């Protein structure tokens, strides 16, 4: 039995199948941890979502910003982007079952000293605190008034965590941290403008995971979201978004032994396949 964490798939279905073949994934005895952004922008969003749902007993998936975006577009709260590849899901006969399954995925998963989250954790948060905060968002997403959450989910504010935050400001802050965070100030104020490489981070900002005395430094955090960051491997940190969508690689980390497995973007996947180039 082995557990594999897999980086952002984003509808790159054939690349996923190639990676599963490489690691010899056996759904009877193995487990997958998916870092979120399962769907969108790659050509196989419907196939990828159906595959994940059909293997739900063998995987844990946390929500990413593209997964939440799909839910908001499906409910009509935001317009689809030109780069979205979600229409096949919306037109599918099993659309409602697929979207409900997606809506009930967690924001964060913690097990045996390891944490799975899509983008990151605010440096002020301990892993235990973050798990409880993520559950607040999960209750909103799974409750009868989930429409209200999706309708007011978008926005960049507030950027600074305060324990007294309430209502949608609190839920939006938690959601943005867990699904959109890359860099912040040393005191933990989030910046959503920067999406580039480590060497290009502007003065006064730093990766969330490099903030001194980060509250979650006592656990191993596994995340994705930041494709320009590339593969990062530290004793207590693994970044697994290696840009498969952009013609890079799809990456898996076997938690037992911390071994990395990678496959190149399949020719049928990624933005080149969509653009016909």
Swiss-Prot record:
InterPro entries, alphabetized: ApaH (IPR004617), Calcineurin-like_PHP_ApaH (IPR004843), Metallo-depent_PP-like (IPR029052)
**Source domain of life:** Bacteria
Q: EC number(s) of the enzyme?
A: 3.6.1.41
The answer to keyword Hydrolase applying to this record is yes
Record-level Gene Ontology MF annotations:
bis(5'-nucleosyl)-tetraphosphatase (symmetrical) activity
Which reaction does this chain catalyze?
Answer: P(1),P(4)-bis(5'-adenosyl) tetraphosphate + H2O = 2 ADP + 2 H(+)
| Gene3D superfamilies in the cross-refs | 3.60.21.10
Question: One Pfam match, by short name?
Answer: Metallophos
Which keywords does the record carry? Hydrolase
Record's family? Belongs to the Ap4A hydrolase family.
NCBIfam families the record matches: apaH, PRK00166.1
Physiological role = Hydrolyzes diadenosine 5',5'''-P1,P4-tetraphosphate to yield ADP.
| HAMAP family attached to this UniProt entry | ApaH
Q: What name does the UniProt record give this protein?
A: Bis(5'-nucleosyl)-tetraphosphatase, symmetrical
Organism of provenance? Methylobacillus flagellatus (strain ATCC 51484 / DSM 6875 / VKM B-1610 / KT)
Encoding gene (name): apaH
